[in-house]
Amino acid sequence: MADVGATGAEIRATRIEKAKTLQAQGMSPYAYRWERTHTAALLQDKYAHLAAGEAVGDRVSVAGRIMARRIFGKLAFFTLQDDSGTIQLYLDKQTISQTMGEAAFADLKHLTDVGDILGAVGTLKRTEKGELSVVVESYTMLTKSLLPLPDKWHGLTDVEKRYRQRYVDLIVNPQVRDTFRKRALITAAIRRYLNEQGFIEIETPVLQVEAGGAEARPFITYHNTLEMQLYLRIATELHLKRLIVGGFEKVYELGRIFRNEGISTKHNPEFTSIEVYQAYADYNDMMTLTEAIITTGAMEVLGTLKITYQGETIDLTPPWRRVTMHDAVLAATGIDFRQLGDLTAAKIAAQKVGVKDLDTCDTIGRVLNEVFEQIVEPTLIQPTFVLDYPVEISPLAKPHRSQPGLVERFELFIVGREHANSFSELTDPLDQRQRLEEQARRKAAGDLAAHSVDEDFLTALEHGMPPTGGLGIGIDRLVMLLTDSPSIRDVIAFPLLRPESAGGQV
């Protein structure tokens, strides 16, 4: 039965029968291993000099997935794909029959399908049409696929299926594979750069007694043996700071973070970030470090600092623009929050420029931040450091050395998204206690993103933490930027989705 016109169930049943036939003939449809001498890319490079019609007697062994089959009587052409690329298999009945017996070519025609994984041994030639090919002397079924590949996968309107069956997406879409290769190169380059600068990566707990280091709702779990509630970490900050207290002067961790919050093209509940802490530095030093980390990633995978994201040209060449939050809001809206006397006046001014959802804003600083996020943030296309945030939304940052009510904090925005967050870290344990106790009061009042006081962290601070600059960069968003990917789901191999039985996509 041909795949064309057949249902998925019919195709599967037919392929199971083919697997049984192979088994009956003494050929396992699921091999244990294969001795491969060359990848497709290595062959394409090594034999690029062959002219059309030229052949060499070098014997090679290849393996990969059949992506296309064309059979013309006593001659067949298969496209074989491995991790490096594709190579054509040139299969003629006479050559294969001499090596494997008369039935081998018929088995090739009738028992193989697109999607199967095949091993082949042969010599090299370039066909008259210019296609480098392995002239197959013998072949072995390595894995019989039971389900068909889609004829056209990339470009389907049902993008959810691409995320849900990522393995199929990876098989048929080279661009997706390239995205994840670039992701690996970016993270490796960042680690290499930091290591060269004298930083050390230390792993901190994922399961934590207290959630802290960010204003975010945590995932909650339970340890049966200890009979205690635990949280999946929402940040690595507080443990990395403990390491600074302990005497490490340059530490970082690149790892997974978990936040029980919304899902969008910019947010996934499980994501990757890197946090970096440097003793005797402040947020000015962290701006320089941020530029270095991001440009390192860009040069690693793109070789240039002038990039394109979703049609927008972005120039990552340092130094990047720096503007205070107050000045950014003033320029965009005409509102000078430094001149507003009370919360009511701040809310009225914000509402006049179209800002919504101000009910939970209980200070002028929170209103300022809401205006910034709704009005200014989407306009920050080129790399921009926004500096000096209200103290009430930055409980772990050091007070600004010259601006009361503000802290030494910046966030980096590119293409209207936050890409990094940094502080001159708060090292005063008494001030830190007051801020964490305020958070605890907010939690008691029902704020799910606020947290209890982490007494052990405060104990660490009371032992003395040197002046420290801290930095966090979202790896997923950075990979989105450097691979021109519109959604965070495009750069996470297996993004969280609601099970199909529960009603499909979130």
UniProtKB/Swiss-Prot annotation:
<keyword id="KW-0436">Ligase</keyword>
<dbReference type="InterPro" id="IPR044136">
    <property type="entry name" value="Lys-tRNA-ligase_II_N"/>
</dbReference>
<dbReference type="InterPro" id="IPR004365">
    <property type="entry name" value="NA-bd_OB_tRNA"/>
</dbReference>
<keyword id="KW-0067">ATP-binding</keyword>
<dbReference type="InterPro" id="IPR002313">
    <property type="entry name" value="Lys-tRNA-ligase_II"/>
</dbReference>
<keyword id="KW-0460">Magnesium</keyword>
<dbReference type="Pfam" id="PF01336">
    <property type="entry name" value="tRNA_anti-codon"/>
</dbReference>
<keyword id="KW-0547">Nucleotide-binding</keyword>
<keyword id="KW-0648">Protein biosynthesis</keyword>
<dbReference type="InterPro" id="IPR045864">
    <property type="entry name" value="aa-tRNA-synth_II/BPL/LPL"/>
</dbReference>
<dbReference type="GO" id="GO:0000049">
    <property type="term" value="F:tRNA binding"/>
</dbReference>
<dbReference type="InterPro" id="IPR034762">
    <property type="entry name" value="Lys-tRNA-ligase_II_bac/euk"/>
</dbReference>
<dbReference type="GO" id="GO:0000287">
    <property type="term" value="F:magnesium ion binding"/>
</dbReference>
<dbReference type="InterPro" id="IPR012340">
    <property type="entry name" value="NA-bd_OB-fold"/>
</dbReference>
<dbReference type="InterPro" id="IPR018149">
    <property type="entry name" value="Lys-tRNA-synth_II_C"/>
</dbReference>
<dbReference type="GO" id="GO:0006430">
    <property type="term" value="P:lysyl-tRNA aminoacylation"/>
</dbReference>
<dbReference type="GO" id="GO:0004824">
    <property type="term" value="F:lysine-tRNA ligase activity"/>
</dbReference>
<dbReference type="InterPro" id="IPR006195">
    <property type="entry name" value="aa-tRNA-synth_II"/>
</dbReference>
<keyword id="KW-0479">Metal-binding</keyword>
<dbReference type="GO" id="GO:0005829">
    <property type="term" value="C:cytosol"/>
</dbReference>
<comment type="similarity">
    <text>Belongs to the class-II aminoacyl-tRNA synthetase family.</text>
</comment>
<feature type="binding site">
    <location>
        <position position="411"/>
    </location>
    <ligand>
        <name>Mg(2+) 1</name>
    </ligand>
</feature>
<feature type="binding site">
    <location>
        <position position="418"/>
    </location>
    <ligand>
        <name>Mg(2+) 2</name>
    </ligand>
</feature>
<keyword id="KW-0963">Cytoplasm</keyword>
<keyword id="KW-0030">Aminoacyl-tRNA synthetase</keyword>
<comment type="subunit">
    <text>Homodimer.</text>
</comment>
<dbReference type="Pfam" id="PF00152">
    <property type="entry name" value="tRNA-synt_2"/>
</dbReference>
<dbReference type="InterPro" id="IPR004364">
    <property type="entry name" value="Aa-tRNA-synt_II"/>
</dbReference>
<protein>
    <recommendedName>
        <fullName>Lysine--tRNA ligase</fullName>
        <ecNumber>6.1.1.6</ecNumber>
    </recommendedName>
</protein>
<dbReference type="GO" id="GO:0005524">
    <property type="term" value="F:ATP binding"/>
</dbReference>
<feature type="binding site">
    <location>
        <position position="418"/>
    </location>
    <ligand>
        <name>Mg(2+) 1</name>
    </ligand>
</feature>
